């Protein structure tokens, strides 16, 4: 609203200035036409009444009501003198030598006045031309602003941008130009390169290439900023929520419930086996230390006390470990739920992020695209990938508090990469082979 008011004010000021220039030009022309406020009677003396008339006009113009009119008058009189020399020289033969001296002085005065009048009028014309250039530049700038305002929707604040996010990520259409831009282009049967080429060709034929370039630049800039901001907001919100939920109420509530409402120490059999193994190793080390130190049999009671203390310490450690496992599990559930809610709320931002990632990928060269696909597939489903999957699955199971079961891990490693390989091949066959066959050819060549 403020932008429209400013543009209207500039337009009215421009119109007012133009109108004032037209009025002044009209008055100057009118003064040139009606430039005889005195009677110029040329008698036997060549120009005496002209000098009297000039003095009379200067007296009349003492209030500076008509600036530079005297110069215009001199210019018109001298011009008429040069155009009609016979009229001014019909009594020249009857003049004496004194009249010739007066005539020469009058001629010099008229010539000087003529030169000064021409200089002043040239200065005025230069000023008018400079002012017209400035007005033309202002008018052209306002026209460009008007075209830009109709071709690209500008949001005045971030809140307004969030409220109108659906309009921003849908189709941006110009009222004056048939330019159509989209923040997200879904994959269809017709390749996007063909539709973009046809759209660009149509726009260039209609003379709207400047607006198209401006729209594409602003749209790409907005997509990049919106995607980076969205990723940063996701990471920040997830970390803040998980940290606050863990420290504020989950940890105290789980600790109180685990220590008072139930009598278990271990969550699963894996923890019990690991605790028993550590206790046996500790007893063996204590017996070995006493044998090496040649302790007497009377000190066996002290050994039982040490074993009891170590057992209590192990129980405390595993009890805290069980609390941490439950805490991590609940925190992960809260983080996943929060992430799903953020995805649902920010569906438009997620679409922009998807479009930005696709644009980054498709903007690469064919060799870089094939290299990226080959690197990703080798990491996930390559020859050495099962060892990595075993480490990842084992760490995840330990994070959730489950036992390190080799059969489950081997079953997962033998099935999941196969499914992932099938998905990759389908994606390459379904999309890349249709959009860019050169990428598929380069990928197969590098893979072989």
Swiss-Prot record:
Chief location bin: plastid
Reactions mediated catalytically: K(+)(in) + H(+)(out) = K(+)(out) + H(+)(in)
Protein location: Plastid, Chloroplast inner membrane
GO cellular component terms, A-Z: chloroplast inner membrane
Key word Protein transport present: no
Its membrane topology: Multi-pass membrane protein
GO biological process: potassium ion transport
Keywords: Antiport, Chloroplast, Hydrogen ion transport, Ion transport, Membrane, Plastid, Plastid inner membrane, Potassium, Potassium transport, Transmembrane, Transmembrane helix, Transport
Pfam families: CemA
TM region positions: 224-244, 325-345, 373-393, 408-428
An MF annotation (GO) of this entry: antiporter activity
Family: Belongs to the CemA family.
Function: Contributes to K(+)/H(+) antiport activity by supporting proton efflux to control proton extrusion and homeostasis in chloroplasts in a light-dependent manner to modulate photosynthesis. Prevents excessive induction of non-photochemical quenching (NPQ) under continuous-light conditions. Indirectly promotes efficient inorganic carbon uptake into chloroplasts.
Protein name from the UniProt record: Potassium/proton antiporter CemA
Organism in which the protein naturally occurs: Angiopteris evecta (Mule's foot fern)
Gene name for this UniProt entry: cemA
């Amino acid at each position: 609203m403020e932008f429209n008011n400013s543009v209207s004010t500039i337009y009215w000021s421009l119109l007012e200035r133009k109108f004032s220039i037209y009025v002044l030009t009209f008055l100057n022309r009118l003064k040139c036409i009606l430039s005889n406020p005195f009677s110029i009677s040329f008698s036997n003396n060549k120009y005496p009444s002209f000098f009297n008339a000039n003095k009379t006009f200067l007296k009349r113009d003492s209030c500076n009501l008509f600036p530079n009119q005297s110069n215009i008058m001199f210019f018109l009189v001298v011009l008429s003198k040069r155009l009609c020399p016979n009229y001014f020289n019909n009594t020249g033969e009857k003049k004496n030598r004194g009249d010739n001296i007066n005539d020469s002085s009058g001629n010099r005065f008229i010539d000087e006045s003529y030169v000064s009048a021409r200089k002043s009028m040239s200065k005025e014309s230069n000023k008018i031309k400079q002012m017209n250039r400035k007005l033309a530049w202002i008018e052209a700038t306002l026209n460009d602003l008007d075209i830009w305002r109709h071709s690209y929707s500008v949001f005045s604040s971030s809140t307004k941008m969030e409220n109108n996010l659906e309009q921003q990520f849908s189709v941006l259409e110009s009222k004056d130009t048939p330019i159509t831009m989209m923040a997200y282009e879904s994959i269809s049967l017709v390749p996007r390169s063909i539709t973009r080429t046809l759209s660009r060709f149509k726009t260039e034929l209609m003379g709207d290439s400047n607006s198209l370039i401006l729209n594409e630049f602003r749209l790409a800039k907005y997509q990049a900023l919106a995607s980076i901001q969205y990723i940063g907001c996701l990471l920040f919100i997830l970390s803040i929520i998980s940290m606050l939920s863990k420290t504020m109420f989950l940890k105290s509530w789980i600790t109180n419930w685990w220590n008072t409402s139930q009598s278990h120490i271990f969550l699963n059999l894996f923890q019990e086996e690991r605790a028993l193994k550590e206790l046996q190793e500790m007893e063996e080390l204590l017996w070995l230390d006493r044998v090496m130190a040649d302790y007497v049999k009377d000190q066996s009671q002290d050994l039982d006390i040490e074993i009891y203390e170590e057992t209590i310490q192990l129980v405390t450690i595993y009890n805290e470990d069980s609390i941490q496992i439950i805490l991590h599990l609940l925190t992960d559930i809260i983080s996943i739920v929060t992430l799903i809610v953020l995805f649902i709320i920010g569906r438009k931002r997620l679409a922009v992020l998807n479009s930005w990632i696709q644009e980054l990928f498709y903007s690469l060269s064919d060799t870089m695209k094939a290299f990226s696909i080959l690197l990703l597939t080798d990491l996930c489903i390559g020859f050495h990938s099962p060892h990595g999957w075993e480490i990842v699955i084992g760490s995840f199971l330990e994070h959730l508090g489950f036992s390190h079961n080799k059969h489950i891990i081997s079953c997962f490693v033998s099935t999941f990469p196969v499914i992932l390989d099938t998905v990759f091949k389908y994606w390459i066959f379904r999309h890349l082979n249709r959009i860019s066959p050169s990428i598929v050819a380069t990928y197969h060549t590098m893979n072989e």
